Amino acid sequence: MAKPALKAAKEALVVKNYELAIEQSKKALSFDANNYNANVFLGVAYFSTKQLSESKEAYLDAIKIDEKAVLAWQGLWNLYESTHDISELHKITPILASKFLELEEQNKCLNTVNKYMEVVKKYGNKADEFKALKLLTPEEGEIYEYLEGRVLPLQTVYMQMVDIQESMDRCYFESEVNKRKTRLGARLEQVMRDVELEIYKDSPLETLYNQIINYAETDEIRRLTESKLLHMYNKLLILSEIKEKSHWRERIWDLIQGMVTLHIPEQAAWTIYFEWQDHSDISFFQSAELQEYIELFPGSPLAQALFAFRNSDLWHKEHPIQLEDSNNSAELAKETKEEDDSENSVDKKENEEDIISSTMMPQDEVLANLTEAYENAPQSTIISECLAKYYIHLKEYEYAIGLSKAALEVLKRLQQDTGVKLDKLTRIFQLCLAIGYSHYEVPRYLFQAMHYYDILLAADPRNYHALLGKGLVQIENEQYSDAVKTLGLLLDDHENDPSLSELSWCYFKTGNLPKAISTVEKCLDVLLSMDVERFKIAEAYYRYGIYILNRKSENYLEDSFSAFVSSLRKDPNYAPAYTSLGLYYRDIHDMVRATKCFQKAFELDASQVEAAEALAKTFAEANEWELVEVISRRVLNTSENDLKRKKKFNWHHTSLGVLELNAKNFHKAIVHFQSALRISPKDTNAWSGLGEAYARSGRYVSALKAFNRASILDPDDWYVKYFIATLEKDMGEYEVAVSTLSEILAVRSKELCVQVSLAETYVRLAKLYHARGFYSRAADSLEKSIQICCNVLKEDITSIFSWEILGDACLSFCQLKNYHNRFPNSLISDILFTTEAMKCANNGRQFENMIYLPDLETSSGAIFIAAVAITCFTIHLSLVADDKLLLPVSWYNLGSSYYRFYECDTTKDATLQVAINCIKQAIKLEAKNYVFWNMLGVLFSQTKAVRSAQHCYIQSLLLNERSSGVWANYGALCIQNHDVECANAAFTRSISIDPDNSQAWLGKAYCSIAVGSIRKAVQIIHHAFEISSGKMPDVNYWYADTMLHAVNTEDFVTTDGDIWSATYAIKRYLGENPTDTFAYYIKASLLEHLGETTDSVPSAIRLCELLEQEYDVSESPVILKRFIDAKALLGRLYLAKKSFENSVEQAGIALDLLEGEEDEDIKRTTLGLNLTCGTASFFLNKLEKSLDCFEKALLVSDSNADVVVLVSKVLWALGSENGKQAAREQLFEALEQSPSHIGSLLCLGAIAIYDEDDAVCSAIEDSIAHLKKDEVLRSGALKQVQIMEVLLTKKIDESMIKSLLQRFLHVYPFAASSWTLLTNRYASKSLANAFATTLYTHPSRPDDLAQSYRLQNSIDRAQVAIHLVPWDSANWKALHGVTHEALVSSDAS
């Protein structure tokens, strides 16, 4: 029943009636569910109608029924092909291909495979392609064998598989590294290693490479694949664990051995072949192998290094050429056989030398090739070995050390990466390190050298090079006994070794002279019988000469001389022998030959320090300092000698320090002296040189330390102490410097340089005293300086610096106007009026057109002193007329002295012109000195030559725009010419350069005054005074003047401290200007405000005397007016002093002088004088006269309220009822005109209390209560107002006193009197604390604050009160009281 359905289904498929075919197939399956063909037909029909899942199911059902049949497999394959299901194709294609193979359907098999390849290539990825290609390999079955010849060859298949795998590995590596490297704590190097290990661990590449090698059709492909396989093995070796490295190492070695054996030109293989073999010398490798490598890879770094090294002088020295091995071996052998006599032997030797020289490269080419090779391949141990050995050969020890260290690191990494351990090669680099350290910067690295020698000897106790090197290091370390033992071990194996010479030296150093001589004699026999370097024989002869010289036997000088000559015959370039010969000739006083020998020794070897020192001394004695410098620098630059401990010399550093010091290279000089002191810390000369270098470079503290150290090492060296004193002087420690110089003179009293320095120090000390206001001390110092200068000039009238210092001292004396009487006129005259001094002043120099000499004999006082200064500087100018360095300064000093003379006598304009000419002359000689231009500007300013002065200041600023003083002077010039804007800019620039320039600040104040900013000017002047510390006279004057103005006008709040500071300032000013009447007036007025009559009265008397003297000379009305003001001031001061009679007298004199004058100023003066006279008369009980004066004052003042109060007081004091009534009336009238006049209110209040007039008391109390706060504070009667209010309140209603005081304190919280009344009346601790806290937080007087602390009734507060006002006995009593109470309470408890 199924057959008809199958037949119908087949026919429907043929006509492509797929629906019918499906129907008939299903019908057939309904009769026979296991019918294979029905399932196949159903799968085909479903596939054709795109019902793929049903088709797949049908094919699978068919395969289950019969797996061996092909149709279902073929249909399923076509289904997967159409859906591009690569994964299923991978599974089914081998099966289908195998089915065709069994059926021997080769074409169908081939077509299936080809289609499979096309689909995979088109729709698959790299992994799919790899899997598809794998089907065509023998490992996958018989398909390749069946289709061989019709598919790709195996070589191609495997190569394509390799390309695909390598591509996949690269993509995986890049993606994984990028992904993992961003993880926290990841290191890129480790990430890359991990990913590479993952790739190579299960990689099929090894198998593929081997298959390519096996099936390769050409040698080129085989070699390329072998190279890849080697690279892979090397990677796996590096990445693998330690236990696995031997496996990969064996594989690599097998691979490269085959390559080398077959002479395959694979560079990596050959390189590993050489690099992995442990060896102690390049000669370990077969020459043919080395030559073959060079020929195979001529451009490689290793080939370059091997070729250069094998053709170097070092190689030929260690491996002498064999003639029979040369290219001309046959011919040379024949010549050798035929020529046996001595003459022919010489020709043979010359022929050998020619052959060697023809094959040898120059040293520079060898080094260049080796260096280039190493730079291109620094990981090559063989290149490092060649270059390190060659560095040692060239004595380039520093490079050898660095290279050997790097090579040892390479070997260490090689062992870590590959497990290859190269012990012999390691010892080669350790030996290079040891040798390098033995010779580089000796003895700095000798410890390291000994360390490596010990390592080498631990591995091989009989290592020749290690024993010899260790022995030499022990000799260098002066361990001669140990060196004897070490060299003895060496000589046990090498009896006739040249090291006998070193052994003899050890015997000599240990004192065994006979053994040393016998050993060196044996050494000479050995050396003369050997073909060794001439240097070795020369050294042995030299040492033999040294031993003979020290034995001092008969004819020892001649024998040692003969040995030294023999040394030079063997090696004419052996420098120590020349040094010894030089010493020999020097001892026999043949200095010409000695010098020649020393020169030759030093030319050959700069480490011959003894020869160098002898040469340096010789040239220094001949003043050939350039040659001394050359020798010293060469010694310094010789590394073999510079750091040797056994030769502790520092003369080269000292001499270079002196040379650099003279060349003004102070930093370099310091370095050299420090180096000298490191070598010899007790070298006094080096300490002195270091101190001088420090001093001349401005580092005075360091210089002082250095000189003090030198002084400790040599206390008797007065020159060091002189330098110390000079430093102390330069540092401003003048008193200490005076003490030091005096100590020197106590021992060496005739040293003129010390006396001159002491005189200069006294002058500087005087200037310091003058700046600090110690004028008497300044005069003392100047007297001593003048005395010393005169003493020096008596010894040497041409002492240049003495004349200069004497002139400077005289100029300083001119400023001490109160002490001119102490100037030693006679002492100066004894010097100046001598014939020798006159000759010095007029020694033939043509200065007549420039210099005007003042008349010393007719001068006196300041003029005489200035004239003496001019004469001193004139003589100084004459003495330095030929000195181009000192002459400009001398002209400047002379010009300054003439300017000082002009300041003392301004009537002599000629002196000012001479001063200008002198400064001009200084500028001609030194036009770039900004100080000279500044001084010329000052002088032109005095002559009103504004343009010239401006030009000079600008020129000075062009030379040095950072000079604050010049800017200040330029500002002063501008303000003198009313250019305020320019002056302000100049002063601002000056302050920006030097913020502590008080003169510039004073100039800023002038500018502020010029533009009307008085308050700002006062602030600036106060700041200028603070920064000047009272040292600037002009600032002192203006500070005191502004303070007096502030006190008189009450424009600014001032304290007693401010007034005391102003008083101090004006006193300092008067100390330098004792005849300034304006300053005396300011001083007396300030003291008047302070209530200090003790000092103010003498100042006012002196003021009157000076003004009287001026008036007698000039009879100027201005002076007369000032004299009257001075008398008025003196009268007030006498009144304050309670010297009433003197007060009346002085006021009377002034009033008499004012008769007939009517202007406003006269009226004010008359008013003050009448008040003074009236008040003084009042206290003298001359009430009538007092009343008369007050009435006159009342008339002059137009019934001024203050005057009315005074008149009322006098009327009341007269005692008559009429007088009292008149007083009341006067006060009422005054209050009508000025209702808030505090004085009138207080006076009338007192009268009302006396009269018990409650109505008036109430009215006065109300008026006082309504007074404005500013009016009370301005009047200065706060305390009186408060007391009056209390009295009036007590009179009216006593119970209101507390509220009154509280209200008063609310308005005036700082009123100490109110707090006192409140505290005394209502005592409490909280009130006392409030009192103290309030005063502490408000500006208050120390006395009031102390009182507040005192009332707190505690020990610590009482102590604070004492600290504030220690002179107040109340504070001490309070402390005593609280202390007593505390003791009593403690006893009671």
Swiss-Prot record:
One of its GO terms (cellular component) is cytosol. It is found in: Cytoplasm. InterPro entries: Ski3/TTC37, TPR-like_helical_dom_sf, TPR_22, TPR_rpt. Pfam families: TPR_10, TPR_19, TPR_22, TPR_8. TPR repeats lie at residues 2-35, 36-69, 90-123, 381-414, 429-463, 465-497, 498-530, 538-574, 575-608, 650-683, 684-717, 719-751, 759-792, 931-963, 964-997, 999-1031, 1124-1157, 1167-1200. Keywords: Cytoplasm, Repeat, TPR repeat. Residues 326-355 are annotated as: Disordered. PANTHER family: SUPERKILLER 3 PROTEIN-RELATED, SUPERKILLER COMPLEX PROTEIN 3. This is Superkiller protein 3. It comes from Schizosaccharomyces pombe (strain 972 / ATCC 24843) (Fission yeast). The gene is ski3.
